[in-house]
Every structure is written in C-alpha cells, then in structure tokens.
Amino acid sequence: MAYNKKEVLQANTEAIRVVLRLEKERRAATETEKSILRNYQGFGGLKCVLNRTDNPDDIRYWSKSEQNLFEPTQQLKQMIYSEALDANTAKRYWESIKASVLTSFYTDTRIVSAISDALASTNLQIRRCLVPSIGMDAHI
C-alpha cells in the first residue's frame, strides 16, 4: 500500500480532466466519470506541482528523485490551461493546486476501514470520533 506519486498524479489528472469536461458541457457526471472522480486524492503529497514546467529544460531544476514526475506534471498544467473555460480560470485552478500542497490531506479508504474494524472489535463505547476522511464519504 505504498504511496505512488506518479499514480496519484495520473489519477488526479484524469479527475481534473473530467471536471473540466463537465464544466464545459454543463452536465452531471456519468457513473464512469464518477468512478474516475472517486480516485482523486488531492496534491498533499505532490510538491512537484510547485516546480517549473514551462519548457523541457526546466527538468534540470528538478531533483533526480522526482524527474519521473516532470512530464505528467507538465501535461497536467498544459491540460488545465488548454481545457479551462478561460485563461483566468486556468490560472486560478493551477494556483489552487499549488496552494493545496501544504493543506491537502487524503486518507485511503483502506486505512479508514482498518481503523473502523479495530474500533469495532473493542468493547469501548465511542461517543465522538474524528473522521480522517471528511469529503471522501468514508466514515468510521
């Protein structure tokens, strides 16, 4: 259950692509699109979006350990700027993604389930419980 930055970045990119399409077409998501949207995890572990990606030479500023994220990050930014309703909206979306790096948190549903199962196996009466997945529709 290791955190794979590239997979998360790709899943987030697909979810954002769906959102941009839905916004343009002014319609609700299909079941298939909802499934893609459920895979969105935020950018809390993806500081790569803070790096420069405007031209291919920018990769030299990236740490070696994250250079495999250069191309998908570049594609994400290009997609947002080409698919958003207008340039101001695209800039707002990209800045929002960058700003969320330090404040976006995601708890995998497997972790929520493990905590829930562990609590259920005790005889403790729980009156209040912090739900680590607010917004993910996963509850303890």
Map each language-model feature to its residues.
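Class I S-adenosyl-L-methionine
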Residues: A2-I140
